[in-house]
C-alpha cells in the first residue's frame, strides 16, 4: 500500500442511514482517550502500518486478526466498492483511495454496501482527529450536532470507532456505543452490525465531499484568523508564534492534531475553566469538560447569548480580553460591556427590549444562556410550563416605588402555570443584582442597603422604570381575562402578539414609542382597547416645552378614531409643535374635548395606574394631578441630559437612533449611512426629514435650512428679506434676466424659460451634489435687499471665493448672453452644492454696450442657480478642463483635476505634490519653457510668441477666452453659427462689442477687455512671476486678446501674453515665496513680482489710496485717473505706473489674478466699449483684491526662508516693504482677519485671503448701486 508522508486533514463520511452520534467535543475526547490507550502515540503517528492485511504486531493499535477480518469484510463487499475522496490539506488537492487500501495515517478504508451503513473509512484515533479537524469548525452541523447526543454515553464512548481493531480496547472504552445493536467482539470489528450506521467523524453527509467547506479559522490566543478551507496556516501560526516551533516535521502530526482540536473544541474555546493554553495542554493533558455547553458558536467563535429562545446578543473574545472575559453586545442596540458572563446583557434585554422576547409554546427544553454560572433562568418541562414573560411582576417597596422585577421559575416536574410555591427569579431595577428566592425579601433588603431605601441613585432610574413597566403593564388583567396564560411570539419589533394556544384570548399589542427630538423611547404592551401613549406625550410636554394642547401623537387618537392596527410597530408621532405657547390651544382643546367621546374605540390608559380616558388632554391632566410628584422627579433627572432650555444638547446626546427601526449608534456619521444602506433613503442631518434620493434631500435642505445659514452668515450685508420671498415650484423653471438689452436692469424676464439639461447631466449632478457643494463653501453667501428686489443674489466672499467656475450648456449659454440665468426654484436661498459658472460672466457680453454699467453683480453666477443646471454643467465643463483653473498654479490644462484640503480644484501635478509633501507646489519646481509650463505644452503645442501670426494669435486667444470665460461669444458663434436668430443676435452684439474694442484699446472699456483677455491668458499659461512685457506694441494689442480675438483684431499687435513675463529683468533666483499663486493673488499689494524698477513707492501708495477710495464701488474707480496710468482704472493687480498707459495696462491686465480673469472673461462683454461704468463695474468686481489674498494664503505654506518681510497673520513673505505695507493695510483693526475695506470679519487667513481675492465687498457695493439704479 502507498504510505503518505504527511497525513492530510480530510473529511470522513459514512453513507446510508448514517446516524450522528458524535459532536466535535466527543471527537476531541476520542483523541484524549486514544492518548490514554496508546502506549506509544508517537510511534503510532509515524509508523502505523499502511495495509490492513499486513501484520501489525509492531503497532499497539491493530491486531492481525481484526485486520484480516476487516480485509475480508471489505473484500466480500468489493462489488460496490467506490473511491473514497479525501482532501489533503498539505497538498491542496483531492486524493483518491481504493476502498481496499488503508494508509497508516489516513484511514482504514472499510466499504460496506450492506444497506450502505457500515463505516466507510476507519482511521486511527490520532489520525482521524488530524484529518477531520480541518472540517471540524466548518461543518455546518457542528454546533447543532454537539447538542444531540441521544444516548447517555461517556465522552469516550465513540473511541470504539477508531480503536475497533484493538482487542483490549474494551477495557478502556465503555461497552455501550452510539447504537444499541453495535457491539465490540473480542476479535475486533468482525461482529460489527452492518445494519447500523456509525458516524466516525463530524460529517453526516452520505459521501465525502470533494472539497472542504470554507470556514473561518481563528487563533484563540491572539485572534489571528482567515477565511478558507485549509487549516495549515493556522497550525503554522500557532506553532511559530505561540509554541516557538519554527520547523515543521513529520513527527508533529499529533501536535498539529491537538492544535486543531483545541481550536475547534467548543469546551476549550468557551469554557470558563479554560483560562489559558499551555504546552502541557497541547501535549495531550487535556481536561475533560462534561458540563453542557451553555453557548453556541458561529464561524468566528463568538458566544451567542440566548434568553429563553431569543437570541439577544453575542460575546466576543478579543485580544484585549483577559482570562475568560468577553465583550458582550446587545443584538438590538449598541449596549456593550466587558465581563465574564452575560447576566448583565440579559437584564439589559429584559429592561430595554422586552417586546423582542420570543416564547415558543412547543419548546420542551430549558433555555440556554451564555453564562457558565447557574444563574436562574426560566425552566420548563412541558409546553407552556416555561416562566412566561407575562408572568413578570414588578416588585415595589413599601413606598410604592418599583425596586425590581421577578419572573417565576417553574420546576422541571411542575406543570402548573402559576404555582405559589415556585421559586422566582428576582433582579434589581437599578443594578445587576439578581437572586433566586421564594419571596422578594432579598431584593427589598438589597434595595434598602444599596439604593438608599427607595431613592434611586441612577439619574434615569424612574425613566427606566417607566420604560420597563410598559412591558408588563396590564399583565395581571390579561392573565385574568384569559383561561390559560400562553406564550406569545413577537416577530422582530412588530407590535402585535397573538396567543398560540387553541384557547381564544384577546390580542396583546406591543408598541414602541420614540421621541422625535431626543433618544427617549419605550415599549408598551397593552390590550386592543387601550393605548399607552401617555408617557410619550408627557415627555414631550415636560422635556421639550411642548404645550400639551399642541400634542397630536396620532391624527386619530385624539378623537378616539384609532384602532390597534394603526399602532402596530413604532409610534414616531407626535408631529408636535415646538412653541411654548400656541395660539391654537383653546380651539384645539375645545375641538378635542367635544369630539373625543363621539366615536370612542380606543382609550388612553395611564401607565402608572388603571385610569384611562379617550381624550389625550384628560389623560395629561390626570398625570398632572395624580402623578405630578413622580413626573417632576423624572423631569429633573432627564434634564441632566438636555440643555438648560429643555432642548437636547447636540454635544451631550451620546446615542443617535433611527426613526425607522431600533438601530442606535453613538457616532452621528454612522446614522446617515444606516439610512442609506438599510432603508435606501437619505436623512437630513438638520432634522428628521428623509428623502428617497439626493435631489429631494438637497431640495429640502435648500428650502428648509438655507434660511438658517443665511441668518448666521454675515458679510457686512443685510440678510433680511430672505424669508419674505416665496420659493416657486421647482417645476416652473423661470429665468430672471439681470441685464436686458433694453437696459432695464432690475426687471425679471419670466417669458424665457431655460431648457432642461440633459438627463445624464442631471444624473451626474445628483451624484456630485454633496461633494461639490458643501455648506462651508457657501458659508458667506447671503441675499441683500436690493438683490432680492432685482431677483439677483449678492455674493459674499465665500460664495464666490471657494467655488470654481463652471461652464454651461450651449442652450443655457444662448440665454446667458442676454442675461445670467437664475432658476426661480431656489431664487430665495443659496443653493448648496452649486459651483460658480463663467456663464455668469458671459451674460454680460450679450447685452448692449450701454447696459454694462450696472451689470457688475450679475456677472457672477448666482448661488441660487438651479443645482441641476449649474452643477451638472460645471461637472461636465470641469471634466473637459474648461472653465476651471488650478487654485495653486492657475493652469487650466491638466489630465486630472484634484481637490485640495480646502475643497478647491487643483491640477494633477499640484494635487499630487501637496498630497505627498503637505505643502503647495512651489513655483521654482514648475518646469517651464519660455515661461510656460511643460505640462501644458503636452496639451497644446505653441509657437514662439513672437513668431505667432496675427491669425494664429487670434485663434489661440479665442481658445483661451473660451476656456477662461466659459466660451467667448465669438467661439460660441463659431460653434453655433447655425443657431436660431436670437442666438445670432447675441453673437452679433458680442461681435460688435469686440469689434469696437480694437478702437477702444486705450479707453477704459478697452482696458477692461485687456484685463479679461490677459487674465485669461495668464490663467492658461500660469506665467512665471517675473512680470515682463516685451513691448508696448505687443501689450497694446492685448486688450482685445479675449474679445478682439474674436474678430482677429489687436491680437497680432501684442503677440503672446507670455512675453511680458519672458523679459530677463528678474534674477534667476527671484521667485515668489512659495506657491506661484502669489504672483496673481495680490492685485495691488502683497505681490512680490512687481518690482521697484517698474514704479516708485510713491506711485504705489497713490495707487493704493485710489484703490481704497474706490472700494465702495465708486464710479470713478475704473475711470482714468490723471495721476495714475491706465492700469489703475482697470484695477489691474500689478499696475506698472511708470510705463506708458498702453504698456502698463497690458501688464496689469495680464497680472490680473486668474480668478478675476475668469470672472472677467465675461467682462469681454463688459468691454463692449460701452459706458465706463460698465467696464468699471465688471472690472471692480473682477479686480477686487480677492484674487491676491486667495493665492497668498497658499503661498504661505511654502514661503522661502530667504524672504524677509512676512505677514504674521497670513504667513506670506513679501520681497519688499512696500508690498508688505500694502498687504498689511488690508488687515482691519478689530481683528487679524478683518477686512479694512468693508470691515467684514473673516474666520481665518484662508477666509480672509478669499475675501480679498474675490473682492466681494466690491460686489456688494456695486450691487447696492445697481439696485438703486434699477429702482
From Swiss-Prot:
A zinc finger (C2H2-type) spans 217-242, 328-353, 426-451, 513-543, 604-627, 656-679, 682-705, 1205-1227, 1233-1257. The lineage of its organism: Eukaryota, Metazoa, Chordata, Craniata, Vertebrata. Residues 1031-1049 have a biased composition (Low complexity). One of its GO terms (cellular component) is nucleus. Residues 1153-1271 are annotated as: Transcriptional repressor domain. Keywords: DNA-binding, Isopeptide bond, Metal-binding, Nucleus, Repeat, Repressor, Transcription, Transcription regulation, Ubl conjugation, Zinc, Zinc-finger. A zinc finger (GATA-type) spans 886-910. Its main location: nucleus. This is Zinc finger transcription factor Trps1. Residues 1-76, 124-155, 353-387, 843-877, 938-987, 1031-1064, 1154-1196 are annotated as: Disordered. Sumoylated. Sumoylation in the repressor domain inhibits the transcription repression activity. Sumoylation on Lys-1191 is the major site. Appears to be sumoylated on multiple sites. Gene3D superfamilies: Classic Zinc Finger, Erythroid Transcription Factor GATA-1, subunit A. GO terms for biological process: regulation of transcription by RNA polymerase II. The gene is trps1. The keyword Cell membrane does not apply. InterPro entries: TRPS1, Znf_C2H2_sf, Znf_C2H2_type, Znf_GATA, Znf_NHR/GATA. Binds specifically to GATA sequences. Residues 54-65, 972-985, 1050-1062, 1170-1196 have a biased composition (Basic and acidic residues). It is found in: Nucleus. Transcriptional repressor. Represses expression of GATA-regulated genes at selected sites and stages in vertebrate development. There is a cross-link at residues 1182, 1191 (Glycyl lysine isopeptide (Lys-Gly) (interchain with G-Cter in SUMO)). It comes from Xenopus laevis (African clawed frog).
Amino acid at each position: 500500500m502507498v504510505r503518505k508522508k504527511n497525513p492530510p486533514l480530510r473529511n470522513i463520511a459514512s453513507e446510508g442511514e448514517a446516524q450522528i452520534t458524535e459532536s466535535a467535543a466527543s471527537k476531541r475526547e476520542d483523541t484524549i482517550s486514544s492518548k490514554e490507550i496508546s502506549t506509544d502515540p508517537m510511534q503510532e503517528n509515524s509508523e502505523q502500518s499502511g495495509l490492513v492485511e499486513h501484520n501489525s504486531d509492531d503497532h499497539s493499535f491493530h491486531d492481525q486478526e481484526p485486520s484480516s477480518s476487516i480485509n475480508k469484510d471489505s473484500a466480500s463487499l468489493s462489488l460496490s466498492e467506490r473511491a473514497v475522496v479525501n482532501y489533503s490539506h498539505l497538498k491542496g488537492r483531492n486524493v483518491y483511495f481504493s476502498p481496499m487500501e488503508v494508509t497508516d495515517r489516513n484511514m482504514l478504508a472499510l466499504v460496506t454496501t450492506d444497506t450502505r451503513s457500515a463505516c466507510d473509512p476507519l482511521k486511527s484515533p490520532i489520525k482521524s482527529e488530524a484529518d477531520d479537524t480541518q472540517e471540524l469548525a466548518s461543518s455546518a452541523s457542528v454546533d447543532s450536532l454537539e447538542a444531540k447526543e441521544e444516548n447517555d454515553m461517556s465522552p469516550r464512548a465513540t473511541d470504539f470507532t477508531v480503536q475497533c481493531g484493538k482487542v483490549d480496547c474494551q477495557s478502556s472504552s465503555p461497552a455501550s456505543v452510539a447504537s444499541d445493536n453495535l457491539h465490540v467482539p473480542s476479535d475486533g470489528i468482525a461482529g460489527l452490525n452492518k445494519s447500523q450506521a456509525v458516524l466516525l467523524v463530524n460529517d453526516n453527509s452520505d459521501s465525502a465531499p470533494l472539497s472542504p467547506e470554507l470556514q473561518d479559522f481563528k487563533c484563540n490566543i491572539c485572534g489571528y484568523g482567515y477565511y478558507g478551507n485549509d487549516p495549515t496556516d493556522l497550525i503554522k501560526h500557532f506553532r511559530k508564534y505561540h509554541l516557538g516551533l519554527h520547523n515543521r516535521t513529520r513527527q508533529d502530526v499529533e501536535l498539529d492534531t491537538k492544535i486543531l482540536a483545541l481550536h475547534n473544541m467548543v469546551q476549550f474555546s468557551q469554557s470558563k475553566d479554560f483560562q489559558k493554553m499551555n504546552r502541557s495542554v497541547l501535549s495531550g493533558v487535556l481536561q475533560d469538560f462534561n458540563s453542557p455547553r451553555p453557548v453556541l458558536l458561529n464561524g468566528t467563535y463568538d458566544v451567542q447569548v440566548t434568553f429563553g429562545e431569543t437570541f439577544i446578543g453575542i460575546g466576543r473574545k478579543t485580544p484585549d480580553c483577559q482570562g475568560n472575559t468577553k465583550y458582550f453586545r446587545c443584538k438590538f442596540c449598541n449596549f456593550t460591556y466587558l465581563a465574564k458572563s452575560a447576566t448583565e446583557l440579559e437584564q439589559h434585554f429584559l429592561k430595554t427590549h422586552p417586546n423582542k422576547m420570543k416564547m415558543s409554546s412547543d419548546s420542551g427544553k430549558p433555555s440556554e444562556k451564555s453564562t457558565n454560572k447557574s444563574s436562574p433562568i426560566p425552566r420548563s418541562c412541558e409546553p407552556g410550563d416555561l416562566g412566561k414573560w407575562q408572568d413578570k411582576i414588578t416588585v415595589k417597596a413599601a413606598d410604592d416605588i418599583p425596586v425590581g422585577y421577578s419572573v417565576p421559575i417553574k420546576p422541571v416536574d411542575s406543570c402548573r402555570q402559576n404555582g405559589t410555591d415556585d421559586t422566582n427569579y428576582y433582579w434589581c431595577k437599578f443594578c445587576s443584582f439578581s437572586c433566586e428566592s421564594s419571596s422578594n425579601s432579598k431584593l427589598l433588603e438589597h434595595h434598602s442597603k444599596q439604593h438608599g431605601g427607595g431613592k434611586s441613585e441612577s439619574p434615569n432610574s424612574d425613566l427606566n422604570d417607566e420604560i420597563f413597566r410598559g412591558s408588563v403593564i396590564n399583565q395581571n388583567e390579561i392573565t385574568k381575562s384569559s383561561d390559560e396564560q400562553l406564550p406569545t411570539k413577537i416577530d422582530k419589533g412588530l407590535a402585535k402578539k397573538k396567543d398560540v394556544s387553541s384557547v381564544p384570548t384577546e390580542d396583546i399589542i406591543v408598541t414602541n414609542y420614540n421621541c422625535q427630538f431626543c433618544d427617549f423611547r419605550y415599549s408598551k404592551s397593552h390590550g386592543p382597547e387601550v393605548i399607552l401613549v401617555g408617557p410619550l406625550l408627557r415627555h414631550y410636554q415636560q422635556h421639550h416645552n411642548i404645550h400639551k394642547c399642541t400634542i397630536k401623537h396620532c391624527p386619530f387618537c385624539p378623537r378616539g378614531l384609532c384602532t390597534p392596527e394603526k399602532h402596530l410597530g413604532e409610534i414616531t408621532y407626535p408631529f408636535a409643535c415646538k412653541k411654548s405657547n400656541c395660539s391654537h390651544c383653546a380651539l384645539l382643546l375645545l375641538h378635542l374635548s367635544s369630539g373625543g367621546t363621539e366615536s370612542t374605540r380606543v382609550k388612553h390608559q395611564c401607565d402608572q395606574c388603571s385610569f384611562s380616558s379617550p381624550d389625550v388632554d384628560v389623560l395629561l391632566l390626570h398625570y398632572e394631578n395624580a402623578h405630578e410628584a413622580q413626573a417632576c422627579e423624572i423631569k429633573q433627572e432627564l434634564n441632566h441630559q438636555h440643555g438648560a432650555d429643555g432642548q437636547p444638547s447636540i454635544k451631550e446626546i451620546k446615542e443617535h437612533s433611527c426613526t425607522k427601526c431600533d438601530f442606535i449608534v453613538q457616532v452621528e456619521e454612522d446614522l446617515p449611512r444606516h439610512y442609506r444602506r438599510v432603508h435606501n433613503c437619505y436623512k437630513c442631518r438638520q432634522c428628521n426629514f428623509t428623502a428617497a434620493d439626493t435631489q429631494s434631500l438637497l431640495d429640502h435642505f435648500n428650502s428648509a435650512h438655507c434660511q438658517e445659514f443665511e441668518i448666521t452668515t454675515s458679510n457686512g450685508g443685510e440678510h433680511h428679506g430672505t424669508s419674505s420671498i416665496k420659493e416657486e415650484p421647482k417645476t416652473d423653471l423661470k429665468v430672471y434676466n439681470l441685464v436686458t438689452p433694453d437696459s432695464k436692469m432690475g426687471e425679471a424676464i419670466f417669458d424665457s424659460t431655460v431648457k432642461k439639461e440633459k438627463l445624464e447631466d442631471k444624473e451626474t449632478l445628483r451624484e456630485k451634489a454633496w461633494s461639490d457643494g458643501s455648506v462651508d463653501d457657501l458659508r458667506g453667501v447671503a441675499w441683500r435687499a436690493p438683490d432680492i428686489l432685482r431677483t439677483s443674489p449678492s455674493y459674499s466672499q465665500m460664495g464666490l471665493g471657494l467655488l470654481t467656475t463652471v461652464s454651461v450648456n450651449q442652450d443655457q449659454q444662448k440665454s446667458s448672453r442676454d442675461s445670467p440665468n437664475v432658476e426661480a426654484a431656489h431664487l430665495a436661498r443659496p443653493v448648496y452644492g452649486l459651483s460658480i459658472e463663467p456663464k455668469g460672466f458671459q451674460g454680460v457680453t450679450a447685452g448692449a454696450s450701454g447696459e454694462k454699467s450696472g451689470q457688475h453683480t450679475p456677472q457672477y453666477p448666482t448661488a441660487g442657480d438651479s443645482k441641476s443646471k449649474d452643477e451638472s454643467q460645471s461637472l461636465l465643463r470641469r471634466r473637459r478642463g474648461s472653465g476651471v483653473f488650478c487654485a495653486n498654479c492657475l493652469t487650466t490644462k491638466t489630465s486630472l483635476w484634484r481637490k485640495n484640503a480646502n475643497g478647491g480644484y487643483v491640477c494633477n501635478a499640484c494635487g499630487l505634490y501637496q498630497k505627498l509633501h503637505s505643502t503647495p507646489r512651489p513655483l521654482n519646481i514648475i518646469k517651464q519653457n519660455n515661461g510656460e509650463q511643460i505640462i501644458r505644452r503636452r496639451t497644446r503645442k505653441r509657437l514662439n510668441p513672437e513668431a505667432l501670426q496675427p491669425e494664429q494669435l487670434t485663434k489661440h486667444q479665442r481658445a483661451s477666452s473660451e476656456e477662461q470665460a466659459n466660451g467667448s461669444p465669438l467661439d460660441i458663434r463659431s460653434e453655433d453659427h447655425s443657431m436660431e436668430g436670437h442666438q445670432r443676435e447675441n453673437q452679433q452684439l458680442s461681435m460688435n462689442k469686440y469689434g469696437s474694442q480694437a478702437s477702444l484699446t486705450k479707453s477704459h472699456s478697452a482696458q477692461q477687455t485687456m484685463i479679461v483677455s490677459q487674465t485669461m491668458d495668464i490663467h492658461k499659461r500660469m506665467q512665471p512671476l517675473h512680470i515682463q512685457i516685451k513691448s508696448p506694441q505687443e501689450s497694446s494689442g492685448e486688450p482685445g486678446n479675449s474679445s478682439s480675438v474674436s474678430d482677429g483684431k489687436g491680437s497680432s499687435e501684442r503677440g503672446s501674453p507670455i512675453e511680458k513675463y519672458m523679459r530677463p529683468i528678474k534674477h534667476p533666483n527671484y521667485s515668489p515665496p512659495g506657491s506661484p499663486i502669489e504672483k496673481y493673488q495680490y492685485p495691488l499689494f502683497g505681490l512680490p513680482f512687481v518690482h521697484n524698477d517698474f514704479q516708485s513707492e510713491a506711485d504705489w501708495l497713490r495707487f493704493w489710496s485710489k484703490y481704497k477710495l474706490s472700494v465702495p464701488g465708486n464710479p470713478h474707480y475704473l475711470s482714468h485717473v490723471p495721476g495714475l496710468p491706465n492700469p489703475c482704472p482697470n484695477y489691474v493687480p500689478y499696475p506698472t505706473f511708470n510705463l506708458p498707459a498702453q504698456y502698463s495696462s497690458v501688464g496689469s491686465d495680464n497680472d490680473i489674478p486668474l480668478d478675476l480673469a475668469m470672472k472677467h472673461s465675461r467682462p469681454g462683454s463688459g468691454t463692449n466699449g460701452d459706458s465706463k461704468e460698465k467696464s468699471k463695474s465688471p472690472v471692480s468686481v473682477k479686480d477686487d483684491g480677492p484674487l491676491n489674498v486667495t493665492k497668498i494664503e497658499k503661498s504661505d505654506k511654502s514661503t522661502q526662508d530667504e524672504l524677509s518681510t512676512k505677514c504674521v497673520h497670513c504667513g506670506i513673505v513679501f520681497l519688499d516693504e512696500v508690498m508688505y505695507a500694502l498687504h498689511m493695510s488690508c488687515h482691519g483693526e478689530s481683528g487679524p482677519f478683518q477686512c479694512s475695506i468693508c470691515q467684514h470679519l473673516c474666520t481665518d487667513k484662508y477666509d480672509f485671503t478669499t475675501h480679498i481675492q474675490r473682492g466681494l465687498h466690491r460686489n456688494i457695493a456695486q450691487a447696492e448701486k445697481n439696485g438703486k439704479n434699477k429702482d
